[in-house]
Amino acid sequence: MAPNHAGKRFSKPHLNDELSNLVFNANPASGPWQEYNFAPESRTQFPQEIFATEGNVQKASSVLGGRRGDMTLSGKDALITFDFYVNTCGMITLEFGELSASGQQVSIAFSESKAFVGRGSDRSMDFHVEDGALSVGVDGQGTRTCPDAQQRGAFRYMTLYMETSGTVEVCSVKTYNNMMPSMGDDLRQYPGFFFGDDEFLNTIWYAGAYTLQLATIPTGTGRRSDWVHKKVGWANDVPAALDGTLEVLTDGARRDRTVWSGDRALSTLTNYIALNNKISTKNGVDWMFKYQTDEGVFPYACPPIWHYGSDSYHLWTYVSLYNAYFFDGGDDAKDWVRQKWPAVKRGMDYALQKIDDTGLLKVTMPLDWGRHPLKGHNLEVQGILYFSLQKCAELAADVMGDEILAKKWSTLATSVKNVSWELP
């Protein structure tokens, strides 16, 4: 069971020889820093506490912590909300006992926050779709596991309630946490670690690492686009990376489950430091390059959302490429970049043709993250262009041996920077 961090006070280290010994003899998988680790000890996770009940619910605590019990729910107003103590994910399994009447119907709703606990799940499909609840038919004794498509990307609270007037007996409740399959069964064995005398900072670091674990999803569990999905429900059963790959780092576990170049440009560094997960990072970059258009445009959001129209995210793709190369290193990483080089140049040519007589890129694809559409000679875009030109010049020289192109892009980067400082 992962620790319950809510309201917990951690012991502070002594900044003396004892701490020095901890650091210099450190093993990332063992040490006092593991007290802050949110990752579970097992992929099979169980509810740990009752958050709320309504109506006729008996022996609710009998199924907590992995115990096999005999909880009953009777009547349409019967409801129970379980607290797993930490964000988890995956496929819920319920075992119904012999006291369960035939022809009954129960529903399951999920929430990451207690603010959204109820008979409907928090939104994972975007603004146009209500997730609602997962309906489960009960015909007496037996075990039910949610369909693969209805696996939940992230939740802490699970609400189970009756839709019919009879009784069901629940003997066990569990979820199989399928995040980051490359880690096997021990999800706490981080290659990296962090430890200091600030409890809050330690907690933030491990919360960030665990967030990336959750967001590293099995390849075939991307979220269906809400553009084509029905208006109620959710579905996490479509590819989010190339066939034959195991997993991919996405922008979020519950909601998008999709590769966005801008998001991963920021998460890649944390991913390498904490988890050293080269494959999930490179798989995401491969997915971006697969969906480059003939014109050279990279996606704003990769499939399954699959949307274009962003100059900033087009350029963020280069940041993602460079970060994956830089943190991987070695001849394999160079070969990986070489395979993409024609696409790198095609995409850069597309961006550079938007530089007008001001010497700056004029935005024509306005989409960006969480803000009004970009326009004109936006400074953010110039900054990303400058960085992309710098790093692609480095790749041109160090990987491709093309000093002429490296000089061209480096000179242009300097020009963009200088002109940007002159913006009114």
Q: What are these model-derived regions, one by one?
A:
Residues 2-249, 303, 334, 339:
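Extracellular/oxidizing-compartment recognition motifs
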Residues 108-109, 173, 283-285, 401, ...:
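Composition- and surface-driven signal marking solvent-exposed, interaction-prone regions
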Residues 375-424:
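Active-site neighborhood of glycoside hydrolase catalytic domains
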Residues 118, 146, 372-373, 404:
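A generic structural signal for short coil/turn motifs at secondary-structure boundaries
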Residues 129-169, 197-205, 212-214, 218-221, ...:
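Aromatic-rich carbohydrate-recognition surfaces in CAZymes
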Residues 1-6, 403-407:
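Polar low-complexity intrinsically disordered regions
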